[in-house]
Amino acid sequence: MTHQPQQSPQFFLTAPSPCPYLEGQQERKVFTHLVGDKANEINDLLTQGGFRRSQNIAYRPACEVCRACISVRILAGEFEMTRNMRRVWSQNRDLIGRVHKAQPSTEQYALFRDYLDARHRSGGMSDMTVLDYAMMIEDTHVNTQIIEYRRRGPDSFMSAKGDGELIAVALTDVMADGLSMVYSFFSPHMQERSLGTYMILDHIEWARAAGLPHVYLGYWVEGSRKMQYKIRFTPQEHLGPRGWQRFEG
């Protein structure tokens, strides 16, 4: 009889449920729990294999007939901003992002609720309470950071701290080969800033500065309008049957 080591992950399959991206489709997921002292290493390997993390669970689509969800990662070292991206970068030069341990705050939750109510009122996260939010942030056994974006203040050059209200937040896993953007949200009242795009650009710069080759964006679904933004950040790689393949757009 073969015994699995205690640290070996066990995988489970969910029951079918309506797909949140493609109308009329059913989704299933394979998942495992990220616990123990090998959680970081396992999360790195699974993310490189197309998994995503939510709290202490790593999952990936395992649909019976559909393969529309494609894992995407940006090649940070080769990335060049488009003219529009340079405009977004310049427009947000008054912001500063500060990296914290993955700890929730009432200020974060207020912004999170504002974001959901304005942009995802009917989504699966729309009824999340403050306790649900705290679990989303804190329930991690891997190297997870939270980045808070605020306007620069008069002392920001010395203190590396922003000033004023919280404008945007990113929950990010720091891995051996890159940054994985787990979830991000921002003020829905500042559409002219394109804050979602700005946070991705900021993560690319962070990865470059840290010598990390990739920024993982999760899944892209062709034909899904809410996912379309992800393929604007090129060059990038898509995960397929033959491994990671370069994609230029």
From Swiss-Prot:
Coiled-coil stretches, from where to where?
Answer: none
Predominantly, its location class is cytoplasm
Q: Show the catalytic activity.
A: N-terminal L-glutamyl-[protein] + L-leucyl-tRNA(Leu) = N-terminal L-leucyl-L-glutamyl-[protein] + tRNA(Leu) + H(+); N-terminal L-aspartyl-[protein] + L-leucyl-tRNA(Leu) = N-terminal L-leucyl-L-aspartyl-[protein] + tRNA(Leu) + H(+)
**NCBIfam families documented for this protein:** PRK01305.1-1, PRK01305.1-3, PRK01305.1-4, PRK01305.2-3
Look up the record and give one Gene Ontology term from the biological process aspect: ubiquitin-dependent protein catabolic process via the N-end rule pathway
Q: Name one Pfam family in it.
A: ATE_C
Matching PANTHER family, A to Z?
ARGININE-TRNA-PROTEIN TRANSFERASE 1 (PTHR21367), ARGINYL-TRNA--PROTEIN TRANSFERASE 1 (PTHR21367:SF1)
Q: Which GO terms describe its cellular component?
A: cytoplasm
Keywords of the record, alphabetical order, are: Acyltransferase, Cytoplasm, Transferase
According to its UniProt record, the EC number is: 2.3.2.29
Per the entry, what this protein does is: Functions in the N-end rule pathway of protein degradation where it conjugates Leu from its aminoacyl-tRNA to the N-termini of proteins containing an N-terminal aspartate or glutamate.
Q: What's this protein's family per the entry?
A: Belongs to the R-transferase family. Bpt subfamily.
Q: What is this protein called?
A: Aspartate/glutamate leucyltransferase
| Superkingdom of the organism of origin | Bacteria
GO terms for MF: arginyl-tRNA--protein transferase activity; leucyl-tRNA--protein transferase activity
Subcellular location per UniProt equals: Cytoplasm
